[in-house]
């Protein structure tokens, strides 16, 4: 069982300047009041982003963010 949700992890990736694509995603998601903040389900978050996140230029960015999230959870 994961100790924290994806959104909580994503917020640790925010960076105001010189951000990579995942950090830019985090910056934009911060302002998305409808983001499924409590979800830990890849499919649920992915569907939400596909339908409601014009700030995400490519789902590959989400896939990379999810990989980093899973890797960070393995370190805990």
UniProtKB/Swiss-Prot annotation:
SUPFAM superfamilies the UniProt entry points to: YozE-like
Gene3D superfamilies the record matches: YozE SAM-like (1.10.150.260)
InterPro entries xref list: UPF0346, YozE_SAM-like, YozE_SAM-like_sf
Family: Belongs to the UPF0346 family.
NCBIfam families named in the record: PRK13672.1
Protein name: UPF0346 protein OEOE_1017
